[in-house]
Amino acid sequence: MSNDEKQLTKEEMKAIKLQAKEEAKMNDLLKERRQKLSDAQERGKDPFDVYKVERTHTSKQIVDNYDELEDKIVTVAGRLMSKRVHGKAGFSDIYDRYGKIQLYLKIDDVGEEKLKEFKTFDIGDFVVITGKVFKTKTGEITLHVTKLELIAKSLKPLPEKFHGLKDPDLKYRQRYVDLIINQDVRETFMKRTAIIKAVREFLDNKDYLEVETPVLSTIASGASARPFSTHHNALDLDMHLRIATELYLKRLIVGGFEKVYEIGKDFRNEGIDVRHNPEFTMIELYEAYADYNDMMEITENMVAYACQKVNGTTKITYEGTEIDLTPPWRRVTMVDIVKEHSGIDFSTVKTDEEAREIAKEKKLELKKELKDCTKGDILNALFEEYGEKKLIQPTFVCDYPVEISPLTKKKRGNPEYTERFEGFIYGREICNAYSELNDPIVQKDRFMQQLKERELGDDEAYQMDDDFINALEIGMPPTGGMGMGMDRLVMFLTDSPSIRDVILFPTMKPTPNRD
C-alpha cells in the first residue's frame, strides 16, 4: 500500500468517525424533541390535535398597516425561527408566507407557566401568537405577546445554514427545507407565479383564449425530442407524454378558435443540465391571419410586459450582465449572423457538397453523418458553433433552413429558407416561432422526409400525424405561432443561474435509502 493510499484511508476513517459523531448528536436531538412532544401530550396539549387557527393578520399586513394597527391586538401564526429568552423576558422571530415578525415576551404578560412552556419550544415549531403591535427602540415592528400556543411540533431540527450542508443538491431534493431557510428562494417562486400571471394577463388582454390539450397521446410530435412512453392497460395502447402542444393547438385554429394559448407541462426524455429538465413548463400561442413578424412583436412585448410587472423595469441583470428587454429587439437572419461571427457567407453556398466541405474545414460537430447532412443542417451547425453564444442582448434570429423546420412556411422570395425565428437572450434560446405551414400536401411531404431522418437514426425527428394532416385538409387559415420555455423566462427575470432554481421540485436521481 502506498503512502497516498494510507493517507486516503486515514482521511476516510476521520470522515466516518465525524459522520458517526454527527449522527449520534442528531439522534440525541431527535429523542429530545420527541420527548418534548410526549410531555406536551401528557399535559393534554398535543399540538397535532389543533385543527384550525384563527389568525387576524399576516406579517405583511402588520408591517404595511402599522400606523392603523399600533397598540391594537392581533393574532398571527407561523414557524418559530429564532428564540432569545433569558430569565423573565426575551425576543423571538416567527416567519409566515410573507416574512418575519418579531415577538416580545414578558413573564408579567403571559404568566410563569406559559413562559416556561415557551422555553421548551424548538426552532421550527409552529405557533399561534396574540399580542399588541408596537415598535422597539430600534424601530422594529414587534408583537408584545399576551397569548401563545404550540400548534405543530417540528421533530427534526432545521440546518442552521443551508450552504453548510454536505449535499449541495439537498436544496433541490428537499425544497421544503430550502423554502424555510432562504427568503430569497421563496421570493423567486413567488415571482415565478407573478410572471406566469402577467403573461396570462397580457394575452387575455389581447383576446387570446386559454385552452387545455391532451398530455397523453398516441403520437408525440410538434418538436424534435424523444418522448416518455407508457401503456394504457384498458385500451391496450402505447401512449406518450406530450413533447409539445403545437399540433393540438393548430387543430383548434382549424376549428375556428382564432387566438389560442396554453401554459402547461411538456416532457422530453433527454439530458439534464442548467437549462434542461425532463419536465418543464411551456407556453405556446397561435393566431389566425398572423405571420412570424406578428409573433416577433407579440413575443417582445409579452416579455417586456412581464418584466415590467414583476421588476418595475424592462432592464435586468443576468449573471452580472445588463440586458435590455425593451422592444424592439434586434432582428437578423441566420445567414447574416453566421457571416458576422464566422466570416462565412452562406448565401454563396449553392450545393450540399459545398456545405460539407465547409463542415470538414471547420470540424463541425454534427448530429448525423456528414454524408447525410444537407446545406441546412450545416448552416444550423455553424450558427450553433459561431453565432448562438454571441447573442447576449435580445435577438430574433430569422429565416431558418427548410430542412430543420418541418412545420414552417417557406420564406417569401427564398424557398430554401423558412419564416421561422428563434429568440435568444444571453446566448440562450428562449422561444421558437413560425409562419405556420398550412398546406396539407407540403406538410405530408415534410413528415415523410422526417420519417427518412428517423430511419437514418434520428430518433428526435418528427413522427407522422395523419389526423393532423386531416385537420389541415379541412383547412387552416394563415397562422402565426410561438412557443416559449416559461422556466427559462423565469430564470432571466429572477437572475437564476440554473433551471433547477426556478422549478420547485426538479427531476433528481434518487438517493439510496438509509436505515
Swiss-Prot record:
Chief site of localization: cytoplasm
Key words, A-Z: Aminoacyl-tRNA synthetase, ATP-binding, Cytoplasm, Ligase, Magnesium, Metal-binding, Nucleotide-binding, Protein biosynthesis
Catalyzed reactions per annotation: tRNA(Lys) + L-lysine + ATP = L-lysyl-tRNA(Lys) + AMP + diphosphate
Swiss-Prot/TrEMBL cofactor(s): Mg(2+)
Localization: Cytoplasm
InterPro entries: Aa-tRNA-synt_II (IPR004364), aa-tRNA-synth_II (IPR006195), aa-tRNA-synth_II/BPL/LPL (IPR045864), Lys-tRNA-ligase_II (IPR002313), Lys-tRNA-ligase_II_bac/euk (IPR034762), Lys-tRNA-ligase_II_N (IPR044136), Lys-tRNA-synth_II_C (IPR018149), NA-bd_OB-fold (IPR012340)
Co-factor remark: Binds 3 Mg(2+) ions per subunit.
Annotated binding of Mg(2+) 1, by residue: E422, E429
Pfam families recorded: tRNA-synt_2, tRNA_anti-codon
Top-level enzyme category: ligase
One annotated GO molecular function: ATP binding
GO biological-process terms attached to the record: lysyl-tRNA aminoacylation
Binding site for Mg(2+) 2: E429
One term under GO cellular component: cytosol
EC number: 6.1.1.6
NCBIfam families: lysS_bact, PRK00484.1
Family: Belongs to the class-II aminoacyl-tRNA synthetase family.
Subunit and interaction comment: Homodimer.
HAMAP family according to UniProt: Lys_tRNA_synth_class2
Protein name per the record: Lysine--tRNA ligase
Organism, scientific name: Clostridium acetobutylicum (strain ATCC 824 / DSM 792 / JCM 1419 / IAM 19013 / LMG 5710 / NBRC 13948 / NRRL B-527 / VKM B-1787 / 2291 / W)
Species classification: Bacteria, Bacillati, Bacillota, Clostridia, Eubacteriales
